[in-house]
UniProtKB/Swiss-Prot annotation:
Annotated TM spans: none
EC number(s) given by UniProt: 3.1.11.-
Role summary: 5'-3' exonuclease acting preferentially on double-stranded DNA.
Domain of life: Bacteria
Domain 5'-3' exonuclease span(s) in chain numbering: 182-264
Keywords recorded for this protein, A-Z: DNA-binding, Exonuclease, Hydrolase, Nuclease
Source organism per UniProt: Streptomyces coelicolor (strain ATCC BAA-471 / A3(2) / M145)
Name of the protein this chain belongs to: 5'-3' exonuclease
Any GO BP: DNA replication, Okazaki fragment processing
GO molecular function, one term: DNA binding
Length: 301
């Protein structure tokens, strides 16, 4: 089981009231919400392996070089020497180090790789997996990894982190008209304002799905642009031609990496805390109470 950690603690932050606080009055709603969510995941699915995948770089330079608008609207501060600072709510930022410390003390593998997003870490673990994979994320970008034949599915939280939608190929075909392999092509054609991806002007989700159904994939659509007999309207042909420079680079930006140099880290689900003393201190300092105890009880069951 692979957790898209940042997307989940964002969901927890907005789904749990900020009246949930540590003894000193510091909000810990994201911390406790995430712990409660992991507890439910482990109870319901009992994964053999669990990895909290992290954004070591939420906006990698190699993606920005190709599409400068990529996530540009979410930059709080540009940092030439390292990853740009991301806009994060003031009361969430201080909770992230607490989340990391608690995961480490629990013994839950926490993996981020310099120069890559959590999506890329997830993509690489998925590519290497020899058995079924559940990807838990609030980011639809990872729908591209869904693969029934390999047992790869997405568990997508709705209503904060209270409910999970199971996304398999049937769900993708019903909602988007594509399978997992086609989702990245659909996304780059249609664009995604939340990630600063412009898409092809005038090609929305339904048109993109129709083009993929007709021509198979992005390469097939691009070949059709140069084929006067292909069933494209003059407007579609014009728009796709004008978007040629974008379409040449967008796949590398949109498709998650599958070749990240992952660390040699144990990923087995822990059955007891790695550092009980550190965990006890964190629980007392941050008032993690029932949330942490419930998760510990579940892990040791």
């Amino acid at each position: 089981m692979l957790l898209d950690t940042a997307s989940l603690y964002f969901r927890a932050y907005f789904g749990v009231p900020d009246s949930v606080k540590a003894p000193d009055g510091t909000p810990v709603n994201a911390v406790r919400g995430l712990l409660d969510f992991i507890d439910r995941l482990v109870k319901d699915h009992r994964p053999e392996h669990l990895v909290a995948c992290m954004d070591a770089d939420w906006r990698p330079h190699w993606r920005v070089e190709l599409i400068p608008s990529y996530k540009a609207h979410r930059v709080a501060e540009e940092r030439p020497a390292g990853p740009d600072a991301e806009e994060v709510p003031d009361t969430l930022s201080p909770q992230v180090p607490v989340i990391e410390a608690v995961l480490d003390a629990l013994g839950i593998a926490r993996v981020g790789v310099a120069g890559y997003e959590a999506d890329d870490v997830i993509g690489t673990y998925t590519a290497r997996a020899t058995g079924p994979v559940d990807i838990v994320t609030g980011d639809r970008d990872l729908y591209q990894l869904v693969d029934d034949a390999r047992g790869v599915r997405v568990l997508y939280p709705v209503k904060g982190v209270g409910t999970l939608n199971l996304v398999d190929e049937a769900a993708l075909r019903e909602k988007y008209g594509v399978d997992g392999a086609g989702y990245a092509d659909l996304a780059l054609l249609r664009g995604d304002p939340s990630d600063g991806l412009p898409g092809v002007p005038g090609i929305g989700e339904k048109t993109a799905a129709k083009l993929l159904a007709e021509f198979g994939d992005l390469a097939g659509i691009q070949a059709a642009v140069d084929d006067p007999k292909a069933r494209l309207t003059p407007t579609q042909r014009k728009r796709l031609t004008e978007a040629g420079p974008y379409l040449a680079v967008a796949p590398k930006v949109v498709r998650v990496a599958a070749d990240v140099p992952l660390p040699d880290t144990g990923t087995a689900l822990p059955h007891g805390p790695r550092d009980a003393a550190a965990l006890e201190a964190l629980a007392a300092r941050w008032g993690l109470g029932g949330s942490l105890q419930r998760l510990l009880t579940t892990l040791t069951a």
